[in-house]
């Protein structure tokens, strides 16, 4: 007969379970998920000042079209150590025909490509590379966090109620992109994982309840590697 301790399974080793105290900040509009994620990260680092944040948005001329490279420049503005990993250094011309990108593609292509071109001179760290789940877990195990671009139509939270978990932009009555075959870009903040259950913990700025979301590693991988994301991930370091 197995003892209660044996039935519970082997004890977790250091690094097997990480759950960082990253505060949840809800987005206000359908377009500002990346900015809400940046606020979460800065607050976690103890560097969020709302007035300074608004001044930074004006200085960097951030509008309603926010790309991951914009968030990297924002982190640099606040002196936050970061590393932006992506599969595409610039804008993928193939996105021009995707409904999510189509509306602002022509005007944004030049702006975004210029940001990539100037990144090194501006000391914004950008790398073209592939990131594994193990890389992400090792980063989180050190107390660091990451902002990840995902396809919200694929991402599935195991903790959220059914009417909400497939909706990316529900706050304040704004347009809701429910689960559809089309790509819907959305930023989330990674805050931990559980190796034993094979799950990833994250904050979704689209809603504050339940506060922390959780999904399987396989679902997370599907969402972050969907065509349209460029596998963008912005690593942010605690020792900033």
From Swiss-Prot:
One of its GO terms (biological process) is liver regeneration. Gene3D superfamilies: Cysteine proteinases. Pfam families: Guanylate_cyc_2. This is Protein GUCD1.
């Amino acid at each position: 007969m197995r003892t209660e301790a044996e039935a519970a399974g082997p004890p977790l080793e250091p690094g097997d379970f990480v759950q960082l105290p990253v505060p949840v900040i809800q987005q206000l509009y359908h377009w500002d998920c990346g900015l809400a994620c940046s606020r979460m990260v800065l607050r976690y680092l103890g560097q969020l000042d709302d007035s300074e944040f608004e001044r930074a948005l004006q200085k960097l001329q951030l509008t309603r079209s926010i790309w991951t490279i914009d968030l990297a420049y924002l982190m640099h503005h606040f002196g936050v150590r970061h590393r932006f990993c992506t599969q595409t250094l610039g804008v993928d011309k193939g996105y021009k025909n995707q409904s999510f990108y189509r509306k602002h593609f022509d005007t944004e292509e030049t702006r975004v490509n210029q940001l990539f071109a100037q990144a090194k001179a501006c000391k914004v760290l950008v790398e073209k590379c592939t990131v594994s789940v193990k890389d992400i877990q090792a980063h989180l195990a050190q107390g660091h966090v990451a902002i990840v671009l995902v396809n919200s139509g694929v991402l599935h939270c195991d903790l959220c109620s059914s009417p909400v978990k497939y909706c990316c932009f529900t706050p304040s009555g704004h347009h809701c992109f429910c689960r559809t075959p089309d790509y819907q870009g959305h930023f989330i903040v990674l805050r931990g994982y559980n190796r034993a259950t094979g799950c990833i913990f994250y904050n979704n700025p689209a809603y504050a309840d339940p506060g922390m979301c959780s999904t399987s590693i396989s679902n997370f991988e599907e969402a972050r590697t969907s065509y349209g994301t460029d596998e963008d991930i912005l690593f942010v370091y605690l020792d900033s």
